[in-house]
Structure formats: C-alpha cells, structure tokens
Amino acid sequence: MIDRYTLPDMGAIWSEENKFNQWLRVELAVCEAWAEEGVIPQSDLEKLKHASVDPLRVKEIEKETDHDVIAFVRAVGETVGPERRWIHLGLTSSDVVDTALSLLLVESGKLILRTLSELEQVVTDLAVKYKDTPMIGSTHGVHAEPITF
C-alpha cells in the first residue's frame, strides 16, 4: 500500500504486525482444535495462548531462512517454551497464510461497510440541507428548466 493514499485504519489492518497477529490467531485456533481432539495437552495449550510475535524478529529470521512462515513459526516459538513443538502442527504455509488473508479481508470489508454507512449519512444530511437549492436542469444533454437539488 502507498502510505500517502492509505487511510490509517485500513493501513493498520494490512500492516505487517497485524498480518503476523492474524497468522498467530490461525495457529492458535488450530492448536485449540488439536487440544479438543486430545492431541495437545490442555496445559500446553494454556502456555501457547501466551505466545506473541515480533515482526522485526520475523524479518531477522527470514533473512536466514528465506521463508516468511518458517521465520514466523521460529519467532513465535521463541516466545514460549517446549510447547513450541505444537505450533504449525499439521499445517502448510498456505493453510496459515490463506486463512489469515481471509480474516484480513473480512476486517477490511467491515471497515469499508462502516465507512460507507458514514458516507451515506453525510450524503443524506447534505441532500436534506440543500434540497431547495436551485440548479440548472438538463434533458437530452442540454440545459433545461431550473430544478432543485
């Protein structure tokens, strides 16, 4: 995204930090599913819920691995103990990236709908405010009788 054209709220959604947070959200949701199936002990899951991700650390590791998701998994693993072995269990990179992308799209869609709702209200208010303002009418591409907004 080009910063000067990006609204702050939309920029925050598509930031590297939020992208990695959504990746972590996906990873933890899968860990919860594994725990429900009895694969991951509940005590390990509770520790995994405290995992975090540092985007700068991910980028640092990515320079070595040349793989964003591997770098992410390692960076998250550094924030937990031996429970790190459960992170990314049974997943492909695409499972994480594509699912997180869907979450980002939903978040963006909600922002767009909220903003459109605000715009609708502004346009409605202006239409009511200026409903009696005269303007030149038009028909077949030429000026016609005066009308109001």
Residue ranges, per PLM feature:
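A helix-coil-helix interface module used to build multimeric assemblies
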Residues: 1-149
